[in-house]
UniProtKB/Swiss-Prot annotation:
It comes from the Viruses. This is Uncharacterized protein ORF104a. It comes from Acidianus filamentous virus 2 (isolate Italy/Pozzuoli).
Length: 104
């Protein structure tokens, strides 16, 4: 792997670390790579806090703002958790509450 690619990889790893720190403040489970996309599970009890704090926290973390483009959909309750996928949810999961898409 070339030096430039290594630096890009390290930059992404640092962004993921920052994202996880912010998500932890919002009572979200850590970022994980599953089924070909980044995803989170949010317990229903945390959803009001997330809506109250998400925008402020994103604006405080430039890496997070650059890394994620956020679109909010109608809430969809699924077994006590809200599904926040990077891409399409896996089979059996209903419409997402929110979707996090990486900027290309």
């Amino acid at each position: 792997m070339g030096r430039k690619k290594m630096m890009e990889k390290e930059k992404i790893e640092e962004m993921i670390k920052e994202i996880n720190e912010e998500l932890d403040k919002l009572c979200l489970f850590p970022l994980e790579f599953v089924d070909g996309g980044w995803r989170y599970y949010v317990h229903a009890n945390a959803i009001n806090q997330i809506f109250d704090e998400l925008e402020d926290d994103l604006s405080k973390v430039p890496a997070l703002r650059k890394f994620l483009n956020i679109a909010i959909y109608d809430l969809d309750f699924n077994g006590g958790y809200y599904w926040i996928p990077y891409d399409e949810p896996p089979s059996g999961v209903t419409t997402p509450a929110m979707r996090f898409m990486a900027l290309k």
